[in-house]
Amino acid sequence: MKVLFVTRGFPSEREIMVGNYEAVQAKALAAKGLDVSVMAMRWKPTRYLFFNNRISHREVDGIDIYEFIYVSVSERFRFLRRFCSPMSHGFRKTFNKYLKEKGLPDIVHAHIVLYAYNTLFLKTEYNLPFVITEHWTLMNTGNVSKEVEEMSIAYRFADRVICVSQALADSLKNNFQINSIVIHNMVSDSFFKSARILSNDNHFTFIAIGAFRKNKGFDILIDAFANGRFPENVCLNIVGDGEERELVESKIRKYQLSNQVKLLGTKSPDEVNDLLCHSDCFVLSSRLETFAIVVIEAMAKGLPVIATRSGGPETFLQHEHGILVDKENVKELSDAMKYMVLHYTDYNSKQIRKYCYDHFSQDVIANQIVCVYKEVLSRNK
């Protein structure tokens, strides 16, 4: 079976996290014997507008990656926008290169409605079976722009729409009257290769991972940690970066927590793996999620989890794996963190890892996706 992924990008040495979720899924399907290629778009700044080589081809672990540069012209250089081609034009030219080298795919699998909309020509002109996986947090807000609402027509052309959580599926049903099925995110096999290392000393380490954006709730997390009045042997490591870093730093200074709360910046998957192994509890303080893949990455290590009811974790996190709290509730989050420091040894790491593997491993989720492909292809004969 020849599958063409349509994505926001694919990881590279320079951009290690771009399209990482889609890359893990593509590799899992390739491991099942499918011929998987990826057609990806790379956002680039204005200086790339007149860059000649806008389409590239590379191979990663047996997967052909066809990428094109899409230039995002800033307001400062808006006079140059007349030289920009539509995103769909870039995808069309990239597909022509793929078509010349590999022929027509059996099925197209687009990730998020933005890229599905800009590759609808694959359905309308080539009549290719078309699957969409939605995991865009924006689609779980109930407050989408008119432009995004127009893009939602792509759902109606799809042979099957997949959502990564029930909350997101409900949102698509309520906002766009779209029926979908739920197939959760998968966790990379690399997270199962090593387990959490229990510390012999008296230190306790919380870890949180994510982009520094408002919806991730790191401001709430710092407030909760400060409210807990933890002794010096309890610390919090935060992995990530972004627009709200200064706000988080100001709160750390305000509460005089610089000795206990560390901002570690962006880390590679291997570095995240190692940090999780040397942590005692994962904390998700998000205001909004579609699933929260970082939670299952932590569970793959055997870590107990504290997570907010933010649209994803409440659908799979069970009481024997951790604690669910209401979002934006500083006291409830703080109380959960204090409880975890005292009772984290009550959680069975082996049981958490097994639950995670049985429900979210590459093998399990890839099998579910292959079943969707077969069902769609049988209807398109």
Region annotations inferred by a language model:
Residues 266-267, 274-279:
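Short alpha-helical donor nucleotide-sugar binding micro-motif in glycosyltransferases
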Residues 167, 186:
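Carbohydrate-associated surface elements
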Residues 287:
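Aromatic "clamp/platform" in nucleotide-sugar-dependent glycosyltransferases that forms part
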Residues 110-115:
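Short His-centered aromatic/hydrophobic patch
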Residues 1-61, 374, 381:
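N-terminal subdomain of nucleotide-sugar transferases
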Residues 319, 323-330, 339-345:
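Conserved acidic donor-binding segment of nucleotide-sugar-dependent glycosyltransferases
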Residues 4, 199-216, 222-225, 237:
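Conserved donor-binding/catalytic core segment of Leloir-type glycosyltransferases
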Residues 304-307:
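Short hydrophobic beta-strand element within catalytic cores of glycosyltransferases
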